[in-house]
Amino acid sequence: MSNTPIELKGSSFTLSVVHLHEAEPEVIRQALEDKIAQAPAFLKHAPVVINVSGLESPVNWPELHKIVTSTGLRIIGVSGCKDASLKVEIDRMGLPLLTEGKEKAVRPAPVEPATPSEPPQNANPITKTRLIDVPVRSGQRIYAPQCDLIVTSHVSAGAELIADGNIHVYGMMRGRALAGASGDREAQIFCTHLTAELVSIAGVYWLSDKIPAEFYGKAARLRLADNALTVQPLN
């Protein structure tokens, strides 16, 4: 037990950043509600950082703050603010001004105009899959929209995997796995070593202490049955 009443430790958290490109409150509200409706398990009541670098002065920050929080999102900080008067307004509301890591600029490849062609008859639909073949480290969040997510390496504690479809982890799974993020109740989670902090399918979740002991650290398959999470051996 520590001899001091408090202890400060460095840590990292995975947060979504909402980049605002429009200052009209009603436009922002509708856009946010549309995004939340696409992935409610991922975004509903989520803590977010608001990036205002794309907004032109003047900005009605109290009104923007009211609109964003009315959608259920929880603002924990603001980034990208260069306007001195706006900084004062944000500070008055008790929100920290944050500095984000710089992103590498990516030059878009030239796009050749496509030649119209007849679609093939009886073509099978292609289901996209996002493949990650490197370790997923603490603090990282990987999202696979409208597809399955496959990770062929380890997932560290504090990392987060999110997919609108299924999630497959062929390594040690210590982080959080959220399948069916857009509400697909048929989604499943497959792990070769299940030691997750949290598993969730379409918003129905277990914390690590709810995972049955006989499946902890084992190869397992999770899915919904009668609106409840179930787990079985992965053979």
From Swiss-Prot:
Pfam family, one: MinC_C
Pro residues: bias regions: 110-119
Gene3D superfamilies: 2.160.20.70, 3.30.70.260
Keyword Oxidoreductase among record annotations: no
Stretch list, region Disordered: 104-125
Record's keyword annotation contains Cell division: yes
Keyword vocabulary terms for this entry: Cell cycle, Cell division, Septation
GO biological process: cell morphogenesis; division septum assembly; regulation of cell division; regulation of cell septum assembly
PANTHER family per UniProt: SEPTUM SITE-DETERMINING PROTEIN MINC
Function comment: Cell division inhibitor that blocks the formation of polar Z ring septums. Rapidly oscillates between the poles of the cell to destabilize FtsZ filaments that have formed before they mature into polar Z rings. Prevents FtsZ polymerization.
Stored NCBIfam families: minC (TIGR01222)
Quaternary state and interactors: Interacts with MinD and FtsZ.
Family statement drawn from the similarity comment of this UniProt entry: Belongs to the MinC family.
Protein's UniProt name: Septum site-determining protein MinC
Organism whose genome encodes this protein: Salmonella typhimurium (strain LT2 / SGSC1412 / ATCC 700720)
